[in-house]
Amino acid sequence: MSQSLFRGSGVALVTPMTPDGIDFPALEQLIEWHIASGTDALILCATTGEGATLTYAERAEIIERSIRQVNGRVPVIVGTGSNNTASAIALSREACAAGADGVLVVTPYYNKATQRGLVRHFTAVADAVDRPLIVYNVPSRTGVSCTAETYAALAQHPNIVGVKEASGSFALIQETLNLCGDGFSVWSGNDEDTAAVCALGGAGVISVAANIVPREMHRLVELCFADRILEAGREQLRLAPLIRALFCEVNPIPIKSAMARMGLCSDVLRLPLCEMSEENRARLFAAMDACGVSA
């Protein structure tokens, strides 16, 4: 690895929708709000952005509009993963051609590749682009997890700069940091693990919660980077009930419900995702109130 991308709190941005398509005015407002709130990077069209149910034309327009609007103020990273290596290459090339600062590539889902296959997959994608690539490890969704040895092999590639680690395994994170050293960044892929990952030497978080508490997530990582670990721990604990509520149903269902309550965007989702149950919505709203989260 020879390129850096960002250090801090990146938001895994939702894709605002209407029943008829993408809500671009809401997306524009969200981007400005995040930049003003200290968000360090924008991650588009990934899990939280419902990338799996966007059309090719929608993806292209979201990427092009967002990059033009951001105009270099923060890095824009695009989710380009697929369980088909050729598709991941094509999506990554298109994002880079549009001006993305980097790509986020999830481990191939459903196929359940071997570790050797994972190395070949990510290497093929990284070979095809001239921008930084972040591996995204989320075995709860994909059915496969990278090992620290796989990360160590991938870290030798000049374009592979780190991993968004959402396995929840601190043993894996520690082993990865030990094996890969400072040249390979580890971002927490779970909001609840942010302070702990940063305290171990992680580069920050790619956050769902930042969609509604961007300033708080930015402050959390900054406290860690300033070695104010006890303060960071207290802030992590304060946010913990809200973070748990944001995952009482599968992401991004709760975060869109929270954002709709705040007037940030609608809670429109695309099937097979659907609206929250009333019971879970009440739980989420109570957690928001307890944490002082409002429009």
Segments (PLM) and residue ranges:
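Short, amphipathic alpha-helical "lid/cap" segments that border enzyme active or binding sites
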Residues: 28-31, 148, 281-288
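C-terminal alpha-helical cap/extension of soluble enzyme domains
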Residues: 5-16, 37-39, 199-202, 206-295
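Alpha-helical structural signal in soluble globular domains
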Residues: 61, 65-70, 94, 98, ...
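Catalytic alpha/beta core domains of metabolic enzymes, predominantly
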Residues: 127-128, 139-247
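A general structural signal for well-ordered alpha-helical segments in protein cores
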Residues: 27, 59, 63, 88, ...
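Active-site beta->alpha loop and helix N-cap motifs at the rims of alpha/beta catalytic domains
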Residues: 3-143
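Alpha-helix N-capping/helix-start residues
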Residues: 19, 24, 56, 148, ...
